Amino acid sequence: MTVILKSHAKVGVYVDAANISRNGGQRMQYDVLREFACRDHAEPLRLNVYLTYDEERAETNAVYRDKARAYQSALRELGYKVIEKRVKWFQDEAGNRYGKANADLDMAVDVLLQSENLDRVLLATGDGDFVQVVRALQNKGCRVETLAFDNVSEELRRESDMFVSGYLVPGLLPTRGDDYFAPGWGAMGSRVRGYCYHHDDNKSFGFMRFLVKLSPYLWKTDSRDPDSPYRTAFFHDSSLPDGFNVMKLPSRNHIFEFTLAEPNGKQPVATDILLVHPALS
């Protein structure tokens, strides 16, 4: 088995919190995000979170103000720098008020300026406006990884050196029924998320692939490799969600959440399968 040596890479993490929260990642665990970004024991040189803050609302709503400040404090305890983008209020011709707080420009400028000292950048966003930022970072010699959940720009996926769905990262987002007493991700009886990489249309069964640990070897997808961080689970089509079209399988774009049951042969069995992404139409 390969021995993982300490990396000398310097990493920057930049989180577009509004985009992530609006698109499936509202309960994202920032400590796990940091661990994922530094999965090869790299040094986290920059950890930036861009948050919106409604100062006008905070003046009249103590609950909002206290929760927002407590959330920011929790992020700082994890080593993140919190960059606050204040909501600006406007009024249209009909007299309706609306707020704006776009942190895209701030985040883009920061990552470009700070990339001089970085080897790798992780952008937590699905916003296609960052495509040019990705290209600029790559031209400066940085490896660029992106992570998001729903409504991800296809162009952003393609331009990134690696795109990872946040749904697949162990522990990054709580699973259904996740609590203190639940088995840990990857253990028998636990809930995990993965995708179907093989499907037999004639015999009506397939195999799910899922991550069991954070690892620098994400490219080793063959679970037979002892260094691979992936495992597989067998499933029968009858266990898939009602209404799901099996002709779409295999697919890396359809992410399922399922329970790992006792092995039927070599692989565990995926049961109680839910479609997490995209939503079942």
Task: Go through the PLM ranges and name each one.
Residues 66-189, 201-203, 207, 240, ...:
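Nuclease catalytic cores that cleave nucleic-acid phosphodiester bonds
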Residues 189-193, 255:
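Intrinsic-disorder/low-complexity, polar/charged segments enriched in Ser/Thr/Lys/Arg/Asp/Glu/Gln
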Residues 204-209, 253-256, 270:
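Conserved RNP beta-strands of RNA recognition motif
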Residues 215-239, 269-272:
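A short macromolecule-binding patch
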Residues 228, 238-257:
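Short nucleic-acid-contacting surface segments enriched for D/E, G, S/T with interspersed K/R
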Residues 201-222:
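Short aromatic-glycine-enriched beta-strand elements
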